[in-house]
Amino acid sequence: MPFAKSERTKKRIIETVAPIFNKKGYQSTALSDITNATGLTKGAIYGNFGNKESLAEACFNHNVKFLQKGLQMTWAAHPSSIDKLTGLLNFYEQNFETVSNNGGCPLMNVAVEADDFHPFFKEKAKTILLNWKSEIVSVIREGQSSGEIKPEIRAQDFANFYIASIEGGILIAKTTNDSTAFFNIIENL
């Protein structure tokens, strides 16, 4: 039974701290932010995670899992390629407020911050981004094979454009505190 309590404690720490890391960034999140938010001591935090890097990784994985789950659910719910691509945009529209309230897109946040300071997180962000792109490319190619999507559409280029539009929309909305830009970008995809 102690194992279950330990796992519950870890889960609670991650769920509490994940939005803080996403909002403030890895570098700017102080141990006092973590202990104040969780009500736990430094020893309790490090007893569960060993170091700040392990906690940050667990929090990043938690934040990204929400978006990955949305992608998987969208792909599973829609048989056609066009519906999959449209469904993913709908997922982002419906969950924009949740993502925004948690500090924005965790992938973009970590990618920007890690580029300058932390190769491990940069590599993790790169892997997730490339996997996301690969999924979109596969959907486009399936659509081309079934005749839904024009064969002259360059799948790699469109996937980059699609991701950049979503991420750029989030960035613009977050920076200007105006979600209208995000919704307009999504609507025009």
Label for each model-derived stretch:
Residues L88-N95, L130-E142, S146, S165, ...:
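C-terminal peripheral helix-coil segments that are non-catalytic and often amphipathic
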Residues A58, Q72-G103, A155-Y162:
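Hydrophobic alpha-helical connector segments
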Residues K52, N63-L67, S81, L88, ...:
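Hydrophobic/aromatic residues within well-ordered alpha-helical segments
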Residues T38-F49:
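Short hydrophobic/aromatic patch on the recognition helix
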Residues D83, P119-S145, D157:
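Amphipathic alpha-helical packing segments from all-alpha helical-bundle domains
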